[in-house]
């Protein structure tokens, strides 16, 4: 079976977009994500996004990590999703809503020559309750807790912003450490549904550098929910102000923390290529 697709990226975090109508076999979405996202045997991407009609928003986004697991939200992905549905004419307004597993998100697109160049997303408010994240903890929140990994002590904080995110503030960022420790914490028994892991370096009151190990995807060049969570907890701890530029390996993202607690993320979304995937699941 042939499936039309478009490949896109948001600051280096790359995704495959397909229409639900072109592949309405929900029982195969998990396996399809594994296949198309494979860097050697598929198209290659961090995740698969499926565009579907919604009864509660302008459009629905179903998101699957490269390991086939479904996720409630993806910050860089939803920017690419917004560009896709706007550029394809599925929505015709610059402010619209997207249904996700973590709720309805409001987005605003900026256009150049009638094509989306950047997207601003209301990521919502951080959830601090360990039971909702979830974290195996009896406290009211899980902030600045100590965790031993391979004989080293790490101070970690975990929040829910669509998906679980664990934040570790470091003096310097070491990619080998990010990959080694990130994988261990992702699968730690503290987190019954696993967790994303963000290593953050405070540059100044308005700038943070972040590297992320994503749950279900591994190391990625960018993570929108991750940088939003980092800024949210950094602001909560008075480490940064309400407006932050986040430096990630794939570029930069702008984060604003509103007085009421909503976190806004703004950044680019770009097309890479489009084509036809020769799927092996459905003949």
From Swiss-Prot:
The record marks 165, 214 as: Could be important to modulate the pK values of the two catalytic cysteine residues. Belongs to the diaminopimelate epimerase family. It is found in: Cytoplasm. Pfam families: DAP_epimerase. GO terms for molecular function: diaminopimelate epimerase activity. One of its GO terms (cellular component) is cytosol. The gene is dapF. Substrate binds at residues 13, 65, 75-76, 196, 214-215, 224-225. Pathway: Amino-acid biosynthesis; L-lysine biosynthesis via DAP pathway; DL-2,6-diaminopimelate from LL-2,6-diaminopimelate: step 1/1. Homodimer. Catalyzes the stereoinversion of LL-2,6-diaminopimelate (L,L-DAP) to meso-diaminopimelate (meso-DAP), a precursor of L-lysine and an essential component of the bacterial peptidoglycan. This is Diaminopimelate epimerase. Its EC number is 5.1.1.7. HAMAP family: DAP_epimerase. One of its GO terms (biological process) is lysine biosynthetic process via diaminopimelate. The keyword GTP-binding does not apply. PROSITE patterns: DAP_EPIMERASE. It catalyses: (2S,6S)-2,6-diaminopimelate = meso-2,6-diaminopimelate. Keywords: Amino-acid biosynthesis, Cytoplasm, Isomerase, Lysine biosynthesis. The active site is at 74 (proton donor), 223 (proton acceptor).
